[in-house]
Swiss-Prot record:
InterPro entries: NAC-dom, NAC_dom_sf. Residues 24-174 form the NAC domain. The lineage of its organism: Eukaryota, Viridiplantae, Streptophyta, Embryophyta, Tracheophyta. One of its GO terms (cellular component) is nucleus. The gene is NAC59. Residues 121-180 bind DNA. This is NAC domain-containing protein 59. Induction: Rapidly and strongly induced by H(2)O(2) treatment in both leaves and roots. Accumulates during senescence and in response to wounding. Mostly expressed in root cortex, phloem, atrichoblast and quiescent center (QC), and, to a lower extent, in root endodermis, xylem, pericycle, columella and lateral root cap (LRC). Expressed in roots, cotyledons, very young leaves, senescing leaves, mature flowers and pollen. Transcription activator that binds to DNA in promoters of target genes on a specific bipartite motif 5'-[AG]CGT[AG](4-5n)[AG][CT]ACGCAA-3'. Triggers the expression of senescence-associated genes during age-, salt- and dark-induced senescence through a regulatory network that may involve cross-talk with salt- and H(2)O(2)-dependent signaling pathways. Disruption phenotype: Delayed senescence accompanied by a small delay in flowering time. The keyword Cell division does not apply. Gene3D superfamilies: NAC domain (2.170.150.80). SUPFAM superfamilies: NAC domain. It is found in: Nucleus.
């Protein structure tokens, strides 16, 4: 499914007329205002239940604990957005059931009015998550902003129960100073390692490009951990598991995407630093001269010796 951005600001699935498309430069983030959430996302969702947005997931807040929500989200590092259907505490009442297995969401403060121009279009409620059961629950740093339609956008042909049923929830975790905390979360549950590697196995990594491996890396990941993991995969492919060889096989090196190596210098530098340390250690233990050991290793690995010189300039630019 293709994702398009219309001039109205919606990031939606499906086709958009060419005249309506806009291009966003790299670095743009999904950070809508309260009014934009109401106008461009919640209202279309209430009118059409099939409406979806690339940046907003769908979740049942009564079945998911707040610390598990980042894994359910589509995008986000500091805050996560969801379409939610509010569960009624009583079938004939209007009170919302805000309990989960581990605790409950409790409203705090006064609801904030949201205006489009001079017209009231929605309301924002702030809630805090408590572990345990009321009234002895323990307050946590998980906060939720819940957006609902109101005023101008409270559609006349829907009952009060129906129009309030669908809301947008923005969830985030705060520090002790009240600022939003950046959270680097791992792969979602059941995807703790690459399905690509599990299905093919380490022995079949040779001939695989690093670009291919990267296609399975989640956006919610720690960069340092990713670098170390990629180095491990890189070394396994080039040297083989448990190998003591000091120089890479040129054929294996050429299997990797040089643009990736050029643009991800930290991975290559970690690999080279590690190999240099190992080289010196083995050189010291063997008592061989550096020139003898280098020449011997090179001859044992150079399977492309008859093809002439190989240009690896793009690999070493870091």
């Amino acid at each position: 499914m293709d994702y398009k951005v219309s001039r109205s600001g919606e990031i939606v699935e499906g086709e958009v007329e060419d005249s309506e498309k806009i291009d966003l430069p790299p670095g743009f983030r999904f950070h809508p205002t309260d009014e934009e959430l109401i106008t461009h996302y919640l209202r279309p969702k209430v009118v059409n239940s099939f409406f979806s947005a690339i940046a907003i997931g769908e979740v049942d807040l009564n079945k998911v604990e707040p610390w598990d929500l980042p894994w359910k989200a589509k995008l986000g590092e500091k805050e996560w957005y969801f379409f939610c259907v509010r569960d009624r505490k009583y079938p004939t009442g209007l009170r919302t059931n805000r309990a989960t297995k581990a605790g409950y969401w409790k409203a705090t403060g006064k609801d904030k009015e949201i205006f489009k121009g001079k017209s009231l279009v929605g309301m924002k409620k702030t809630l805090v998550f408590y572990k345990g059961r009321a009234p002895k629950g323990v307050k946590t740093n998980w906060v939720m902003h819940e957006y609902r339609l109101e005023g101008k956008f409270a559609i006349d042909n829907l009952s009060k129960t129906a129009k309030n049923e669908c809301v947008i929830s923005r969830v985030f975790h705060t520090r002790t100073d009240g600022t939003k905390e950046h959270m680097s979360v791992g792969l979602p549950p059941l995807m703790d390692s690459s399905p690509y590697l599990k299905s093919r196995g380490q022995d079949s990594l040779a001939g695989t490009t690093l670009g291919g491996l990267l296609s399975h890396v989640t956006y919610f990941s720690d960069q340092t951990t990713d670098d170390k993991s990629l180095v491990a995969d890189f070394k396994t492919t080039m040297f083989g598991s448990g190998s003591t060889n000091f120089l890479p096989n040129i054929g294996s090196l050429l299997d990797f995407d040089p643009l990736f190596l050029q643009n991800n210098s930290s991975v290559l530098k970690m690999l080279l630093d590690n190999e240099e340390t190992q080289f010196k250690k083995n050189l010291h233990n063997s008592g061989s001269s550096e020139s003898e050991l280098t020449a011997s290793s090179w001859q044992g690995h150079n399977s492309y010796g008859s093809t002439g010189p190989v240009n690896l300039d793009c690999v070493w630019k870091f």
